[in-house]
Amino acid sequence: MNAMDSQSTQINMEYQFTSDRNGITDKQRKDVSAILDVSARFKIFINDDLYFDQAEFPILEFYTYLYNWKKAIDQSKRAQEFHYYTLEFDEYEDGAILSIIPFGDSARLKSIWAEQELYHVFDLDYLIRAFLTLEKDLKRDIEAYFPIKLDKFIKHIPAVVFDWNR
């Protein structure tokens, strides 16, 4: 794939909460099982092709990974790999549920749960901006839908800790 093709690769991410609006409250911020039960239908389209589709995706846990990744980018002032794993699944020999793999000024999106194998190369800045926008939108929408403040939850939501590139 040449550079022109990578410039035209587009990503679209959609989510719809599947958990009850009152399924979690600020009082449950330390309840890991309640946190993991909060789910959404999460889809990723690459150039209008369905790439990733999970009906009961643990959205608070995923948000935590995005939040930690955003912090690592802010602190290091450079692009970082992103890898999402869930506590509910433990077979990762083939990789993470979702990964952003940067190389040069480009990046790939990879998933062990992909609906179909698509090998698309993205502009690195474009893909990072798309996932940082997703983090911001998720925070806004989670707090609007559920009666919680993520700032109170974030330190209690389990997540794998990575050694970020400095």
PLM features: what roles do these ranges have?
Residues 112-166:
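Mixed-charge, glycine-accented linear interaction segment located at domain edges/termini
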Residues 1-9, 159-166:
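N-terminal domain-onset segments
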Residues 20-22, 89-90, 151:
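Short linear sequence elements within intrinsically disordered, low-complexity coil regions
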Residues 25-36, 73-74, 96-102:
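Short linear motifs in intrinsically disordered
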Residues 80-126:
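An exposed acidic His-Trp-rich patch
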Residues 61-68, 109, 129-133:
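Short, surface-exposed linear segments at secondary-structure transitions and domain or protein termini
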Residues 55-94:
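Compact, well-ordered interaction domains used in eukaryotic information-processing assemblies
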Residues 2-64:
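N-terminal low-complexity, intrinsically disordered segments
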